[in-house]
Amino acid sequence: MLVLGIESSCDETGLALYDTERGLLAHALHSQIAMHREYGGVVPELASRDHIRRALPLLEEVLERSGAARGDIDAIAYTQGPGLAGALLVGASIANSLAMAWNKPTIGIHHLEGHLLSPLLVDEPPPFPFVALLVSGGHTQLMRVTDVGVYETLGETLDDAAGEAFDKTAKLLGLGYPGGPEVSRLAEFGTPGAVVLPRPMLHSGDLDFSFSGLKTAVLTHVKKLGGNVCEQAKADLARGFVDAAVEVLAVKSLAALKKTKLKRLVVAGGVGANRQLREALSSAAQKRGFAVHYPDLSLCTDNGAMIALAGALRMQRWPAQATDDYAFTVKPRWDLGSLGA
């Protein structure tokens, strides 16, 4: 079965073709970072308009790369939510319009389920069950993943997501957009231990997170430094922030493995591309004897490949979830725990 995936939940337009026998055939992605940079964040109206411009050229690109023809496609999967309402509507409209023209079924996919399953796109995918650390700009959760559609929330952020804390720290340090990668890059030049920041809820005894206090600690430190902060002071603060965030994420992930008695950890979402986090978890895996799996770096960000994969896996298990009536809704807010099989 060949599935076309369309992702448009925020500021990336992604299309991909996934075959249930041959795997990922091709994926193409357009990022809107350059367009939103001058505003310091995503402008929803601009994001929606750009999705409209980019989707069909990206479709032609994945068809050319894969060698597939439009008639070879068996179904179309699209991101139904959560995300920006206008951006979701663009992707859903394009998916259902193509499906109507080609007489193909469609299936709406939860954006976070796509991230959860994205490590299955590697050459040696992790078998179920596993613990997943889902860490991105809008979400920070630990999940027990028993199978496709069988997800249990073990812990989640009580306030800000880790990615939000990265972005806020970048703004406080006067860094560019997007902030997360900029903070991580600057932290590479920081002196370990020069700035020690709190590790919120590190010893709370549960698997929940909190990053608002860490953001406040960064703000307090910036105010103490005053104006005209030198680059080394910025780098030291960035290093202190990254060290604190990574330690909390790693310690909670290890606790989730211990609680569930599982030996496999999957890391997904944009913050999962962070080098320091990967090194910390990989080091712990070697010492403690568990396996840790990541998607390819190119698939940590939002992408169509994960949507195509999730659509294919769901249609294999539950063909009735696909529809050919081309009536659709989008869900800007959608709890992953309510998804089910």
Curated annotation (Swiss-Prot):
It comes from the Bacteria. Binds 1 Fe(2+) ion per subunit. It catalyses: L-threonylcarbamoyladenylate + adenosine(37) in tRNA = N(6)-L-threonylcarbamoyladenosine(37) in tRNA + AMP + H(+). Coiled coil: none annotated. One of its GO terms (molecular function) is iron ion binding. Substrate binds at residues 134-138, 167, 180, 274. The keyword Repressor does not apply. Keywords: Acyltransferase, Cytoplasm, Iron, Metal-binding, Transferase, tRNA processing. Its main location: cytoplasm. Transmembrane segments: none annotated. Its cofactor is Fe(2+). GO terms for cellular component: cytoplasm. Its EC number is 2.3.1.234. HAMAP family: TsaD (MF_01445). PANTHER family: TRNA N6-ADENOSINE THREONYLCARBAMOYLTRANSFERASE (PTHR11735), TRNA N6-ADENOSINE THREONYLCARBAMOYLTRANSFERASE, MITOCHONDRIAL (PTHR11735:SF6). Belongs to the KAE1 / TsaD family. Required for the formation of a threonylcarbamoyl group on adenosine at position 37 (t(6)A37) in tRNAs that read codons beginning with adenine. Is involved in the transfer of the threonylcarbamoyl moiety of threonylcarbamoyl-AMP (TC-AMP) to the N6 group of A37, together with TsaE and TsaB. TsaD likely plays a direct catalytic role in this reaction. This is tRNA N6-adenosine threonylcarbamoyltransferase. It comes from Paraburkholderia phymatum (strain DSM 17167 / CIP 108236 / LMG 21445 / STM815) (Burkholderia phymatum). The gene is tsaD.
